């Protein structure tokens, strides 16, 4: 991927417009998790340390375009950013009428981009209005890269220079390393409740990987495709044929979809449900599979430890309940111990990584939920394509 990087630009004396993703959650009117704000600091600090003035823009929540309500206000985000930077970060509400006059080291924030008419439709005039504020545009919002919007795509077309921020560049470099030139063998874990939501990812990865590990409800559908009884487990009977095709595709190239030989079952989906380990052949009609068994976990752990590249999306069991967390824990620890380059993404995956304390041992943790999944699907990300076009 050829794109310009912020860290390669001379920004001294320039105004830099950074599209960040600071769409943080709130609880009782206060920011409950500032991870996304902290993730944006590297690009902002690079600009400030190198003599630039900075304009930050972000979306917050899901406001109606053309309307402004108190909950849409980015002021609490700006205040928190200011406290992290040790600076006063003002919010600009009327930036189209009054272009800000900034000095080197200043940091300001535009009001919520999603209240601007034309933002979601990728309006070129709005993109030009954003671009008119800056000498250099920086996209550092990988989480929104799969959407073509005025603050991510149109602005990149119109700005004098368009480049990737520290976070965006790191994300794209890691994804490129994992998917474009992977060290072999390459192993992917794709887990979740439904094959239907991950079908295109499964099909795309089946072309790339040497082993395709499936988990959760997805694994149950594959077990059905192998003719196994799964009791009352969650599965999609209408996707059994698609599952067979994916297994055949993997087998034809000498790979496989290794399915569990033992599982952890329960009679109910509940935090206090009794967990029983069973051979896959012994699952009863009134039981549901809620995790992979210890033998299966050990076999998959060996695959992961011998891998050159690991892509992880989704826990293989109901890890929120400790009695069904063993499989996901074993795989998380195997990835942590592996010499493979590992990349993980998706909300549940990140929660599992945090729960089992292996954050530091994962090669790269992706910040972009939907964008990460679309990259795995092999889709073009509009905001990234815009940067590549400008970097060519």
Swiss-Prot record:
Tagged with keyword Ubl conjugation: no
Catalytic activity: (2R)-3-phosphoglycerate + ATP = (2R)-3-phospho-glyceroyl phosphate + ADP
EC number(s) reported in the record: 2.7.2.3
Originating species: Neisseria meningitidis serogroup B (strain ATCC BAA-335 / MC58)
This protein's pathway: Carbohydrate degradation; glycolysis; pyruvate from D-glyceraldehyde 3-phosphate: step 2/5
Chain sites annotated for binding ATP: 198, 320, 346-349
The UniProt record lists the keyword Nucleus: no
Pfam families xrefs: PGK
Quaternary data: Monomer.
A cellular-component GO term for this protein: cytosol
Residues the record lists as binding substrate: 21-23, 36, 59-62, 114, 147
Domain of life: Bacteria
Keywords, sorted A to Z: ATP-binding, Cytoplasm, Glycolysis, Kinase, Nucleotide-binding, Transferase
InterPro entries associated with the record: Phosphoglycerate_kinase, Phosphoglycerate_kinase_CS, Phosphoglycerate_kinase_N, Phosphoglycerate_kinase_sf
Top-level EC class: transferase
Gene Ontology process terms (BP): gluconeogenesis; glycolytic process
Name by which UniProt lists this protein: Phosphoglycerate kinase
